[in-house]
């Protein structure tokens, strides 16, 4: 059985026996923005993506569940929507050919910033990056 069927995609708490969330009332029929990842997408064969929490010009943040660590976390996706778009079938980002150099430069900066943040584990008020990987022609950072 798919482990995501037991989890609410709004808060990543276990669903009740009636398959409803008694914590946040999220339902699977809530639409998501097509340019971003759909709930129940699995990243790196490890992280179940839930609803999108926020997005800006740099990317999007999603609540997610770590199937290995068995904990909730946040996935941050590099997705500058003015430079690329998502292929709806493959989930890969397709970069506008005129923007390829800019896309790669900004993605490198995104990765560099998150590498620095991952070394700041001792600071209480900074979300710690616990994992970073490339998939779908972009970079993802998992925050604790």
Question: Which residues does each PLM region occupy?
Answer:
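ATP-binding glycine-rich loop module of kinase domains
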Residues: 67-111, 115
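Short pocket-lining segment of the protein kinase catalytic domain that shapes the ATP-binding cleft
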Residues: 141-144
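Short beta-strand micro-motifs within the conserved protein kinase catalytic domain, predominantly
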Residues: 128-139
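Short Cys/His-rich micro-motifs in 6-15 aa windows
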Residues: 15, 23-35
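Flexible N-lobe loop architecture of eukaryotic-like protein kinase catalytic domains
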Residues: 54, 121-125
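A short, low-complexity linker immediately N-terminal to eukaryotic Hanks-type protein kinase catalytic domains
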Residues: 30-49
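Short cysteine-rich clusters marking metal-coordination/redox-active sites
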Residues: 8-11, 21-24
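Protein kinase glycine-rich loop
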Residues: 50-56, 61
């Amino acid at each position: 059985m798919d482990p995501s069927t037991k989890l609410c995609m709004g808060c990543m708490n276990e669903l009740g026996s009636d398959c409803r969330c008694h914590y946040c009332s999220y339902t699977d029929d809530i639409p998501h923005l097509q340019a971003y990842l759909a709930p129940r997408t699995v990243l790196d064969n490890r992280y179940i993506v839930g609803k999108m929490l926020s997005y800006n010009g740099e990317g999007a943040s999603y609540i997610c569940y770590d199937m290995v660590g068995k904990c909730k976390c946040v996935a941050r996706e590099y997705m500058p929507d003015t430079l690329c778009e998502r292929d709806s079938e493959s989930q890969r980002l397709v970069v506008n050919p005129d923007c390829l150099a800019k896309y790669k430069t900004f993605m490198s900066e995104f990765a560099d910033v998150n590498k620095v943040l991952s070394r700041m584990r001792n600071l209480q008020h900074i979300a710690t990056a616990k994992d970073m990987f490339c998939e779908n022609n972009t970079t993802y950072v998992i925050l604790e």
